[in-house]
């Protein structure tokens, strides 16, 4: 006897909610202190449909190393773990023999020497083979150094080193704060600061994954040139400039529509026997007023976003 199943579909497929890559990127960007042009959302979504993940073993190691550091362990051990193991730089990380990168800043009676560099595997330590210049500091990498002849922040100093050697990427850290620096020659400096104080918590895993996605070894040595971090930053800048240009065109069109609407409203009021605009109001005054109103709306929406 065959029993008939009722009330449910046999073999029904459960559909998972689509993964919102935009929200994932917005989540970690909200927890990173960015100054200057950075990675745009379209570039992030195209390059990382999903952020690079960490294995169960990597997460366990991260919690252990983070805990040792927070319990008073050597901050140098923590920094070495992050660079060599978490990011996987391994033998591409160099911390000795870096005098070749020394830069004198005579006007501030200061000499800059990096604390570490990332060099192409198998190459001698030299600026032309270097992908990133790093500096270890004693305090917040984006705050001025007290008691120094030069009050520039550690991030500013890394940017100076980067431009001196034509290496666009830098990293300044005190162990807790990791300031990614983009310092292209002839361009403005960008800093993106990741705070590692809660990296051992599950809620902060997205930020850790973003940090690893941007700076892991493979991003420097195992992708095509147009997929390296400097190239992605350049592409983001071009994307942002295009958005700004389009916004300018849209604002101008909106101003013209607003001025035309004001003109129609005035004509309608006069037809009804009203006075219209005061006689001393010139057309250019109306246009300037419309521009002022439209720009305030744009800035308000930008601030809200």
Model-derived features: positions:
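Short, basic/polar, glycine-containing "phosphate-handling" surface segments that engage DNA
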Residues: 1-70, 125-302
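Acidic-basic catalytic patches of nuclease active cores, encompassing PD-(D/E)XK
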Residues: 67-102
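Generic alpha-helix structural propensity
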Residues: 74-78, 111, 153-156
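Glycine-centered helix-boundary capping/hinge motifs
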Residues: 88, 108-111, 166
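Short acidic loop-to-beta-strand element that houses the catalytic metal-binding Asp/Glu
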Residues: 102-134
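Adenosyl-5′-phosphate
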Residues: 305
């Amino acid at each position: 006897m065959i029993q008939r199943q009722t009330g449910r579909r046999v073999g029904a497929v459960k559909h998972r909610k689509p993964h919102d890559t935009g929200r994932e990127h917005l989540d970690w960007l909200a927890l990173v202190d960015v100054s200057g042009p950075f990675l745009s959302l379209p570039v992030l979504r195209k390059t990382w449909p999903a952020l690079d993940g960490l294995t169960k073993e990597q997460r366990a190691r991260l919690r252990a190393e983070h805990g040792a550091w927070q319990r008073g362990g050597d901050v140098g051990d923590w920094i070495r773990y992050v660079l060599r193991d978490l990011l996987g730089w391994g033998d591409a990380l160099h911390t000795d023999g870096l005098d070749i990168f020394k830069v004198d800043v005579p006007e501030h009676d200061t000499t800059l020497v990096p604390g570490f560099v990332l060099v192409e595997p198998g190459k001698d330590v030299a600026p032309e083979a270097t992908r990133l210049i790093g500096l270890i500091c004693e305090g917040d990498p984006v705050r001025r150094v007290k008691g120094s002849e030069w009050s520039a922040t550690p991030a500013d100093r890394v940017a100076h080193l980067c431009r001196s050697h034509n290496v666009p990427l830098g990293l300044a850290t005190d162990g807790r704060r990791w300031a990614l620096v983009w310092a292209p020659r002839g361009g403005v400096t960008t800093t993106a600061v990741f705070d590692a104080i809660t990296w051992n918590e599950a809620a902060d895993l997205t930020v850790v994954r973003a940090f690893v996605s941007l700076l892991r070894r493979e991003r420097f040595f195992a992708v095509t040139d147009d997929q390296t971090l400097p190239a992605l930053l350049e592409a983001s800048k071009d994307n942002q400039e295009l958005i700004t240009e389009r916004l300018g065109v849209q604002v101008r069109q909106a101003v013209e529509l607003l001025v035309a609407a004001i003109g129609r409203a005035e004509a309608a009021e006069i037809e009804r026997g009203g006075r219209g605009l005061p006689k001393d109001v010139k057309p250019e005054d109306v246009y300037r007023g419309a521009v002022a109103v439209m720009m305030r709306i744009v800035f308000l929406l930008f601030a809200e976003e």
